[in-house]
Amino acid sequence: MASSTDVRPKITLACEVCKHRNYITKKNRRNDPDRLELKKFCPNCGTHRAHKESR
């Protein structure tokens, strides 16, 4: 089981407009302590939108 202090935890990325959780990825907590935000394609909206790390 993954520890809560894991260096590379799994995170989900949610679309900022429609709030659907479309992507699962990993991030390095030491390099990116803040919330991750990427511009990715949202299949629900049909366009490229900003996706933020959700809890």
Swiss-Prot record:
GO cellular component terms, A-Z: cytoplasm; ribonucleoprotein complex; ribosome
Lineage start: Bacteria, Bacillati, Actinomycetota, Actinomycetes, Mycobacteriales
InterPro entries registered for this protein in UniProt: Ribosomal_bL33 (IPR001705), Ribosomal_bL33_CS (IPR018264), Ribosomal_bL33_sf (IPR038584), Ribosomal_zn-bd (IPR011332)
GO biological process, one term: translation
Gene3D superfamilies: Ribosomal protein L33 (2.20.28.120)
Annotated Pfam families: Ribosomal_L33
Record's keyword terms, sorted: Ribonucleoprotein, Ribosomal protein
Protein name: Large ribosomal subunit protein bL33A
GO molecular function: structural constituent of ribosome
Membership in a protein family: Belongs to the bacterial ribosomal protein bL33 family.
Species whose genome carries this gene: Mycobacterium sp. (strain KMS)
Keyword Ribonucleoprotein: yes
Domain of life, source organism: Bacteria
